[in-house]
């Protein structure tokens, strides 16, 4: 526990092209070794691919994908009486977006397309259509929470 109190949460600046804080957070999750220009060019290229393939506004497709990827429930391990229980808990809004972005980027990196912008674009479009690995991960997390519903009364 920190002695000097909690550190204030820094708010990210909105993205200059799409004017969206969620897009900035996605760029930050894509970024490796501080190469933000490279991450943003990958994202904008991916959004261009989404625009070409769907004909819709890429930010709207991305927000739809995020709504399909963000988890509502998750399980937390808690030790009670010498045994560990997986207790389902509701996910806080900020953690929901963080997990959604993390899963979207990590499963995009695991795809087999040739370039990262293609991988990211296809993962976002799949997530918007309620398919894809990131949505499957969310379903798995929800299934775990549902399976351990009997332990919900333990509360964190």
Swiss-Prot record:
Keyword tRNA-binding in annotation: yes
Q: Which SUPFAM superfamilies match?
A: Ribosomal protein S7
Q: Keywords assigned by UniProt?
A: Ribonucleoprotein, Ribosomal protein, RNA-binding, rRNA-binding, tRNA-binding
Q: Could you name the Gene Ontology cellular component terms for this entry?
A: small ribosomal subunit
**One GO molecular function term?**
tRNA binding
**Which GO biological process entries does UniProt record here?**
translation
Pfam families, per this entry?
Ribosomal_S7 (PF00177)
Which superkingdom, per the lineage? Answer: Bacteria
Question: HAMAP family, per this entry?
Answer: Ribosomal_uS7_B
Give the protein's biological function: One of the primary rRNA binding proteins, it binds directly to 16S rRNA where it nucleates assembly of the head domain of the 30S subunit. Is located at the subunit interface close to the decoding center, probably blocks exit of the E-site tRNA.
Q: Which family does it belong to?
A: Belongs to the universal ribosomal protein uS7 family.
Q: How does it assemble?
A: Part of the 30S ribosomal subunit. Contacts proteins S9 and S11.
State the protein's name. Small ribosomal subunit protein uS7
């Amino acid at each position: 526990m920190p002695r000097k109190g909690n550190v204030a949460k820094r708010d990210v600046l909105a993205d200059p092209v799409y004017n969206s804080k969620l897009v900035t957070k996605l760029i930050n999750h894509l970024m490796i070794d501080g190469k933000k220009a490279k991450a943003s060019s990958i994202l904008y290229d991916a959004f261009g691919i989404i625009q070409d393939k769907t004909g819709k506004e890429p930010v709207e497709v991305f927000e739809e994908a995020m709504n399909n990827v963000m988890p509502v429930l998750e399980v937390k391990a808690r030790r009670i009486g010498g045994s560990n229980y997986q207790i389902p808990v509701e996910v806080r809004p900020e953690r929901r977006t963080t997990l959604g972005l993390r899963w979207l980027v990590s499963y995009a990196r695991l795809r087999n397309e040739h370039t990262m912008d293609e991988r990211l674009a296809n993962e976002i479009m799949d997530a918007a259509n309620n398919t894809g690995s990131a949505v499957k991960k969310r379903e798995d997390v929800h299934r775990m929470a549902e399976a351990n519903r009997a332990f919900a009364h333990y509360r964190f």
